[in-house]
Amino acid sequence: MQNRALLAAFAAVVLTTASSPAYSLAGGAAREISFAAEHDSGTIIVKTGERKLYLVTGGGRALVYDIAVGKPSEQWFGKSWVSKKREHPTWTPTPSMRARNPRLPQSIGPGPKNPLGERAINLGWGAYRIHGTNTPNSIGSAASSGCFRMRNADVKELFERVHVGAQVLVLR
């Protein structure tokens, strides 16, 4: 009898979670939400003050992800686009990063020490990217040099959903 009660309780939790609008998709932490914005499906909207990235899915809906944003002195706002998508990217410090810390390595190849994590989605101008991270505890903070960090599971999901040319809007 106890086994049936335990099984019924477990099934209720699973069914409640699966039918919830905040259900986590594909192993990441994305939540599907109502999103009252007039943007095409596939548009990425970053709200730096919220530390959130929204992927518009259409029909008044969007997926929302928690992110890390640039330090206050490194933040930028405006329009861009997805210019390239890279799996297992190599990280190369920018000249400004190297000026701040000359001891940085020339580059870090794919692997657990790579600051870009498992995926990088390059944006159309500058050295800015939406990428994974090797410091997941930074998610929710203003910690980067202007890029947008995501948990690796989340950036892998986003990587599969966005296409080169997709519009990116970065808002306060």
What is each PLM-predicted segment?
Residues 9-15:
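Hydrophobic helical h-region of N-terminal Sec-dependent signal peptides
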Residues 1-8:
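Bacterial N-terminal signal peptides that target proteins for export
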Residues 17-21:
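N-terminal signal peptide c-region/cleavage motif recognized by signal peptidases
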Residues 46-81:
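N-terminal, post-signal-peptide region of Sec/Tat-exported proteins
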Residues 39, 59, 71-74, 78-79, ...:
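Exported/periplasmic cell-wall-interacting domains
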Residues 42-44, 51, 119:
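Residue-level detector of beta-strand structural context in well-folded domains
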Residues 54-55, 90-93:
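Short, solvent-exposed loop/turn elements at domain surfaces
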Residues 23-43, 73-74, 80-86, 162:
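Extracellular/luminal recognition modules and glycoprotein regions
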